[in-house]
């Protein structure tokens, strides 16, 4: 069994399907999708319909685009027709996503499945691969609030994170009322943070895999100079900085030459790519 992480598909369902074929994803495997499956690309409706009907071995986290969509959808329970999108989501692809959904058969019927699905999403999870805990999050955590010491008391910290978090079996909602890696972070931080996480020279208290921020060549040069001289990655590539692994490879900007969908096999950290231009 292999466990994979992918993020920021942004409505490129055909590319997503090609990735599933490339990794030979099967019923014994696990897939974690770290948010932002919608907006920007031409196939948001197909991606959302697939997401609301997948088997239990596929798990979704809430990204900032799901956050924007839920902010609108949760206030308009009657259906998609005539929905007021709002400026923020409209500026980030929401209008096109709603139009795409409306163009599909039974769109308003599927809307209620979509509401149920979106209401269940949380922005992070902690899983275990070979007895190693790994934090999965859409955007990142605020380094200012790191206060775990996994070297002195690893069992306590790992148990704390499990209590705070969410698992596929329990679907426990996140709470943020105690200290620790995740406990003091609000959901907005975990879905929207960028530079203060990406450019922090503080290692995360445990291995972390995140999306949201594709790393450009210029940003990687800054990381190599200021953060981690052993970092790797760059435009269109999965980044490895300290113990933080960024898997957004730029599908929000599909016309860039380097844009790709990246996927990371967490068992051995093997990388897989599908170019935005791959047909």
Name these PLM-found stretches.
Residues 1-50:
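N-terminal active-site segment of His-dependent metallophosphoesterases
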Residues 2-10, 134-140, 245-247:
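Active-site-proximal beta-strand elements of phosphoester/diester hydrolases
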Residues 8, 36, 51, 63-64, ...:
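Divalent metal-coordination and catalytic microenvironments
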Residues 10-14, 39-42, 65-70, 143-144, ...:
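Active-site environment of divalent metal-dependent phosphoester hydrolases
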Residues 45-49, 53-127, 131-134, 143, ...:
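Active-site neighborhood of divalent metal-dependent phosphoester bond hydrolases
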Residues 110-137, 142, 147-217:
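His/acidic metal-ligating clusters that form di-metal
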Residues 221, 232-279:
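Binuclear metal-dependent phosphoesterase catalytic core
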């Amino acid at each position: 069994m292999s466990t994979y992480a992918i993020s920021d598909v942004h409505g490129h369902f055909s590319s997503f399907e090609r990735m599933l074929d490339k990794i030979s994803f099967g019923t014994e495997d696990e897939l974690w999708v770290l948010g932002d499956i919608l907006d920007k690309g031409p196939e948001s409706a197909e991606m959302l319909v697939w997401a609301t009907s997948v088997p239990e071995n596929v798990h979704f986290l809430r990204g900032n685009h799901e956050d924007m969509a839920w902010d609108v959808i949760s206030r308009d329970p009657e259906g998609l027709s005539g929905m007021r999108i709002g400026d923020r989501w409209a500026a980030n692809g929401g209008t096109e996503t709603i139009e795409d959904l409306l163009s599909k058969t039974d769109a308003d019927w599927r809307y209620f499945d979509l509401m149920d699905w979106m209401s269940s999403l949380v922005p992070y999870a902690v899983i275990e691969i070979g007895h190693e805990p790994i934090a999965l999050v859409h955007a990142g955590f605020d380094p200012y609030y790191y206060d775990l010491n996994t070297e002195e008391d690893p069992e306590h910290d790992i148990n704390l994170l499990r209590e705070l978090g969410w698992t596929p079996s329990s679907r426990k909602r996140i709470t943020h009322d105690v200290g620790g890696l995740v406990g003091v972070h609000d959901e907005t931080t975990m879905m929207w943070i960028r530079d203060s996480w990406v450019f922090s020279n503080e290692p995360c208290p445990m291995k972390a895999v995140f999306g949201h921020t594709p790393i450009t060549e210029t940003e990687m040069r800054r990381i190599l100079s200021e953060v981690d001289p052993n970092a790797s990655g760059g435009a269109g590539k999965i980044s490895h900085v300290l113990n933080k692994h960024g898997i957004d490879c730029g599908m929000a900007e599909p016309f860039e030459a380097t844009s790709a969908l990246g996927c990371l096999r967490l068992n051995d950290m093997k990388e897989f790519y599908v170019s935005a231009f791959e047909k």
